[in-house]
């Protein structure tokens, strides 16, 4: 019985050790386009058509954090092809951007780069911890 308990505790600790990375899912019009736990701009670039953007629907971002980041503040950052920030919004674990809003952003640029910024909810810790934006996905408009 003790051996089973020790093996169980070892497995639990190994599982929790392996779950250090945050992960995210990006969904466009109820279709999952990215699910990942690491930033890779080339791999997470998706082409979207004007017809997809004209449909009624949403771009949904679901961000899953490990326990250490559970109560941290998250921001979604949207940049254009020239690395100019065009939109930002704070969110808890998920957020939705309507296709009509994406369409208005795509009138100004043909490429949207979406990042997440995770920072401590305690403002006194923000200067201690290096904040880095994580690339979630890139949307390129195909005309």
What are these regions (language model features)?
Residues 19-143:
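Terminal leader/tail segments of proteins
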Residues 1-21:
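Bacterial Sec-dependent N-terminal signal peptides
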């Amino acid at each position: 019985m003790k051996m089973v308990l020790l093996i169980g505790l070892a497995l639990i600790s190994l599982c929790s050790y392996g779950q250090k990375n945050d992960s995210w899912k990006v969904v466009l019009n109820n279709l999952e386009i990215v699910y990942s736990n690491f930033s890779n701009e080339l791999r997470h670039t998706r082409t979207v058509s004007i017809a997809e953007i004209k449909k009624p629907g949403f771009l949904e971002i679901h961000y899953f954090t490990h326990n250490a980041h559970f109560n941290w503040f998250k921001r979604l950052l949207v940049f254009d092809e020239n690395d100019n920030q065009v939109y930002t919004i704070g969110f808890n674990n998920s957020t939705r951007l309507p296709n009509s809003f994406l369409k208005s952003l795509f009138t100004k640029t043909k490429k949207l780069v979406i990042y997440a910024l995770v920072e401590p909810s305690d403002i006194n810790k923000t200067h201690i911890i290096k904040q880095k934006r994580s690339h979630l996905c890139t949307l390129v408009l195909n005309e």
